[in-house]
């Protein structure tokens, strides 16, 4: 799954920084900057969806998910952890 692939690249950048990498520069700026960026991206999703621009909404959701993956890597949360939470919630709702 592509989310796993992107997450793996992000983890690699954390472990072995690459000069000029956006992920590395974001991580170097600290958690507060990353959290601010996630807030900005979430707002951009809302604005795009409110405007009815499907393609822009997709792009903004992709940006939001990407930055959430960076946060997950920083916090030691794997994609598997999130998939498990989705599965738990989905299965709970099906009972």
Protein language model features and the residues they cover:
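Flexible "arm" and connector segments at domain edges
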Residues: 1-61, 65-95
